[in-house]
Amino acid sequence: MLTSNIQKSIRNSYQNLQAQLDNFVPRRAQNYLVAEIAKTLCGQYHKSNRILVAEAGTGIGKSLSYLMAAIPVAVHNNRKVVISTATVALQEQLVNKDLPLFRRITDREFSFILAKGRQRYCCAEKLATASGVDGGQLAMFETKPKKKDIELLETMYRSLAQGKWDGDRDAWPKPIDDRIWQLIVSDKHSCNNSLPGHRGCPFQKARSELDKNDVIIANHSLVMADADLGGGVILPEPENTIYVFDEAHHLPHVARDHASASASLKGAAAWLEKLNQSISKFSSLADEKRVARFRNDLQDSVQNLIPALTQLTKQFDPAQFEEGIYRFEHGELPTWLENQSKELKQFSKKANQSVAKIADLIAERVKDGELAARLAEPALAELGFYIQRLENLAQVWHLMAEPTREKGAPLARWLETHPDREGDFIVSVSPLEIGWQLDQQIWSRCIGAVLVSATMRALNSFHYFCHQVGIDGKPESGTQFLALASPFDYQNQAELLIPAMKYEPSAPQFTEYLIEILPKYLEDKKANLVLFSSYWQMNQVAEALSSEFIKRGWALQVQGESSRQEILKKHKKLVETYKTSVLFGTGSFSEGLDLPGELLENLVITKIPFGVPTSPVEQAHSEYIEKKGGNPFMQITVPDASKKLIQSVGRLLRKERDSGRVTILDRRLVTKRYGQALIDSLPPFKRKIEY
């Protein structure tokens, strides 16, 4: 229930915000968003389904809105808040700017912490060994270590021991080489809380800190990893949590990637052979009587897996592959492969269970003081590596062996020729739809959830997004939907131009035509951004126009030629000195690129960003929709393009006083039946359509 206490707390923080910020402009949309989040989370619309899906345009102040509403509700009810983002940039903004600001303006005391995956932390015991503190140093290196590597490890060890560093890779003053990090990274098997020597490890300390905090900032991948473990393992349990998913439009893809699995055949056989040779070494560290059964089971499983995987590589004919890929239509496997998958599932599962049991028995002896930690550590780290690989292998064959579903979307299953190993194949499996899983793991269990993004709707509807993430969009379900327009005055600040064009992007002459007409739509002494749908076309146009741009005194920078940071730094310098700056970019430049004011006044989009279903998952999804009598182009491709186009045009106005022009060089917006729907889903720019 939305108590007067919570309402008062929210009102106070809003009033204090006005006092804190000199240039604060009260926004009705922000007020409304705060109120709707609070009402939804307090069960005012629906007692059990407390979910709000909100599209909030640029400039509304999304992050402060959900902090102002969700934190008072959670603290009042003694619950946790997990804020999940898709990018590091937004996490940094929340931790360094928004949360400290909210802490200053609220009357509620709360604590917050950034949660990271285990792989961001070092293991104190591994670091001690690698730096030579407890002997066994050289055994950790495959080749003789360089002097500077040893010196770095020693410095890191001292900093950790003296409390000057917390073991977080991102907190070390300089980047740490992957080669060094792999030696000391925490893994869930050797860096285990049940082992006395690891209770003070950086990861264990960070995890225990999570429990003490009210607000936890995570990323979508970490939330999915916790959900896969049953929830409440890495993060607080869903039943005690209010989730806020910012940049929520990324959630469907992150969730799908998380539920996918792949493994190479020869590659797996090779590391299984190494495991086979080490079984006796590992077993000798455990209690002989208790380990015997698991050692025998492991030997039996591994000795069945190696020939089966090797034999499988001879069953596939690369001549039947298209561009190195063979996809099983409708996810259906031939009977012989179905049977083989069931066997491989059995053996890999048995091997995984046996290795995990041997690791447990070794850890038990360390705990009981029967085995020195320094002898067990290297073995447990190595076993951790094998357990991780076996878990993945077991997951691949579990999904491959799963019977074809009578209802719902099938699994996408495919093979790829290995890019680096001749005669090897990668076996991959992915679900097509992940919504039901998100519902089971999160929506049906959590206290409440808020999903926000600047681009949530496709073609002015939330339907596509709801289907992707498994949220019931029917009015009677109780789910709340909100689409808040940006506070910008689009009509007076920006123009959308769709010029008359000789060719559409599908015409073979389009690239040549683009080279001919593009300079006409660029502005002298201004900041220009041109967005392409393909790297190939971008590079062709850049190459053809570079000499003309030099003649005109225009500075051209192309995505990929330098780091994004370097490109933007140079761009800023050019704009500050009143030079013409032209940026060429593709997909990743159409999202998350923040160029306010004079840093971007002219945006050109060369074509509607239609995705081509090239990946096996996209192809399988299209096939499934066709089988159901649907139209994949209208059901997947157009809604996806709509979201991407909204993101692209969103680069132009970043702050309330910004202005400029967007030109879209794709006549299909006018000539095709879906064109009007795409235009109508864009912000309400002043439109100029040439005929």
Question: Model segments located where?
Answer:
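Conserved interdomain hinge at the start of the Helicase C-terminal
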Residues: 440, 499-533
